[in-house]
Amino acid sequence: MSEYSQTVPELVSWARKNDFSISLPVERLAFLMAIAVLNSERLDGEMSESELVDAFREVCKGFEQTTESVAVRANNAINDMVRQKLLNRFTSELADNNAIYRLTPLGMGISDYYIRQREFSTLRLSMQLSVVASELHRAAEAAEEGGDEFHWHRNVFAPLKYSVAEIFDSIDMSQRVMDEQQSSVKEDIAALLNQDWQAAIANCEQLLSETSGTLRELQDTLEAAGDKLQANLLRIQEANMDSGGSELVDKLVFDLQSKLDRIISWGQQAIDLWIGYDRHVHKFIRTAIDMDKNRIFSQRLRQSVQHYFDNPWTLTIANAERLLDMRDEELTLRNEEVTGELPLALEYEEFSEINEQLAEMIEKALLIYRQEQRPLDLGAVLRDYLAQHPLSRHFDVARILVDQAVRLGVAEADFSGLPAEWLAINDYGAKVQAHVIDTY
């Protein structure tokens, strides 16, 4: 949980004043990692210049570079790393030509990122979460006991700040490294499929399953410990509020809760994204297999034609008679020339003629309301008209009558915004909702 007290302009001015810069080609980076590995084997953490030259010689062998003038090139590399504040040089008057070198925090941080952070395993994560759980439990008990400001700072704030927060940062950094490993696995799978996908299927399956299993184990470990960690953080938060509340503790607990939520959610998100990638790879492989069937057939056919005189062959062709489609494209869904008898009421007229007659009759009947300026109760009029017609015509009659009525005028009640009452217009459940038309 890093906190930066400097502002951006202050940091920019500081970097410019000290002329900070880092340039690490792959050879220099390998040299730095070699120094870190050899340095970890020493109890004092110090290395002489001759030992650094030997390490540089091993790096040159690894890159198949010439061993001529190794001492000069090693001296240039050492001086460059001292200038970039990756190494500290210590000299004395008694041994001017035998300086001692130690890695700086920057050099240790870079080498640690490329070496130790790669060792991201379920066991390491479990140990980190176990330490965090123990620290949080002790801090929660100390918070519930209460005490003065010194007690809160020593037994609650300090463990959260310098132990729990740093382990959370380490887990977060490890998860970011895991993201890079997933990207590296994707690149390996793409390279395998581009070379020879048939031989690469087994390797791709192994890479996919190993990564999926690792992500699943890590997520199970996080979920198992996440609830307990959150519970202890809530205990500390409640005890802090009951005791009057320390702003530093409250802010730190909130930051830790956010960090823990982000750590746990990372696992599930990584699993979901990897499942999607897994499906994409398998779909690609299936498509490649389907395409390769045709490619193999065409290749074998081409070879057979080329070597026909050496290995004659016969080709048997099966040509079945073509099936003709006898459907009529102009055939309508419903034949107009239907058989059967029409009802007597419809025997002499078409449907459109009925609608025209109804429209004329209703229009003439409704004109009386406009001429006499009488209010038109649409519900009552509809009920009277529908009673004069069979049920089969109720819908058409109602539609025509409403269409003619709204052409005559409007209802003042429509502008009030109040809904009209539902009125029954026949004995079969049909209803209408309309205000009385009173303005023509």
Swiss-Prot record:
Which intervals of the chain form a coiled coil? none
Question: According to its record, what are the GO cellular component terms?
Answer: cytoplasm; nucleoid
Alphabetical keyword list: Calcium, Cell cycle, Cell division, Chromosome partition, Cytoplasm, DNA condensation
Q: Where is this region: Leucine-zipper?
A: 208-236
Alphabetically, the GO molecular function entries are: calcium ion binding
Which compartments is it annotated to reside in?
Cytoplasm, Nucleoid
Which GO BP terms sit in this record? Answer: cell division; chromosome condensation; chromosome segregation; DNA replication
Q: Which NCBIfam families match?
A: PRK05260.1 (NF003615)
Q: Cross-referenced HAMAP family, in alphabetical order?
A: MukF
- Assembly information from the UniProt record: Interacts, and probably forms a ternary complex, with MukE and MukB via its C-terminal region. The complex formation is stimulated by calcium or magnesium. It is required for an interaction between MukE and MukB.
Family, as annotated: Belongs to the MukF family.
* Protein function: Involved in chromosome condensation, segregation and cell cycle progression. May participate in facilitating chromosome segregation by condensation DNA from both sides of a centrally located replisome during cell division. Not required for mini-F plasmid partitioning. Probably acts via its interaction with MukB and MukE. Overexpression results in anucleate cells. It has a calcium binding activity.
Protein name from the UniProt record: Chromosome partition protein MukF
Name the source organism.
Photorhabdus laumondii subsp. laumondii (strain DSM 15139 / CIP 105565 / TT01)
Give the lineage. Answer: Bacteria, Pseudomonadati, Pseudomonadota, Gammaproteobacteria, Enterobacterales
Identify the coding gene: mukF
